[in-house]
Amino acid sequence: MTLTLDEVRHAIVARENPTLTAAEVELHAVTVHRILELKQQHGVVILGHNYMEPLVYGLSEKIEQGDSLGLSRSAAETEAEFIIFNGVRFMAETAKILSPEKRVLIADREAGCSLADNFGATEVQQIRAAHPGVPVMIYVNSYAEAKAECDVCCTSANAAHIALALPGDELIFVPDLFFAQNLEDELQGRKRVIYPGQGNGGHGAVCEVHEQFTLDDIRAVRNGFDIPPGHPTRRLYVHWECRPEVLREADFYGSTTQISNDIAQHVAAGSLERAFIASECELTSNLMEEFPTVQFWTACSVRCSHMARITLEKILPMLEAIDAGDDLQQWEVDLPPKVIEAAAAPIQRMMELSAAS
């Protein structure tokens, strides 16, 4: 059931910065209410990544929210004709690959990713040629053309499991340099991990958000926010894409959903009073709303410029175009059938190996 306009107003006032003017609250409320109204009217699924700002994130039902792996599964399972993906372009591409018969839309097709933008199909071909016969595992933060050149895909939630499930004693991991190093540490010698940027092996890409966190930053948080290592009710969380030396300082590390689940478990047990998350700041914003009893130290200078391109003002016109039966070309994700077919294989293999865990 769609919220009334008055209910939306109250939710925005409770959720947002109290410095919002009455006019700003009204503008947001009218926009959100209209989006939710059209979403329900046309049976549109709105998938929301954890890095969306709270007002955008809140457009998605709980089952429509999550990290790349969860949203990929949701895209594959939905029967809706229209999928609006509130995330970045590679995520919307993945939804299209898994549901080629569906119409997948993204509010801004220029919403890229520093990992995907800096490592494409040509780079995959080069590293594969340098290591013939070695399986290539590609992080989901990549475009369809690059995925099409690989054997299996992975997300930050399942990379270690997928790596161990592959045949042989070595694998190629692309494109994330820091994630590859962290995966290598996690596997503890059970597999050799080959990755771009290793030795003289070309360049590796990094996440422009997570690379900002340094060891000095993490130690400053521990001291300034009083989160000593091993504290029973205070925890420091780190995302897989951070530098290895930062990851080693964590009380818990993982994907956004793994971090969220750990917080939920500790809150349920009454064993979490304070937390810091070394990741995109809107993840913390959304968790602050979900877990109001936890004191979070925010890092909201650390924002993904690509995720920030997805706004209420860009989402509403898509739904209005659906309502009017207008052309959706400027928002629609369109991939060549051959690319969809080739990129689907490594994603489907990931799904199969994940389900076997």
Protein language model regions, located:
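Active-site loop-to-helix "anion-binding N-cap" substructures in soluble metabolic enzymes
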Residues: 1-357
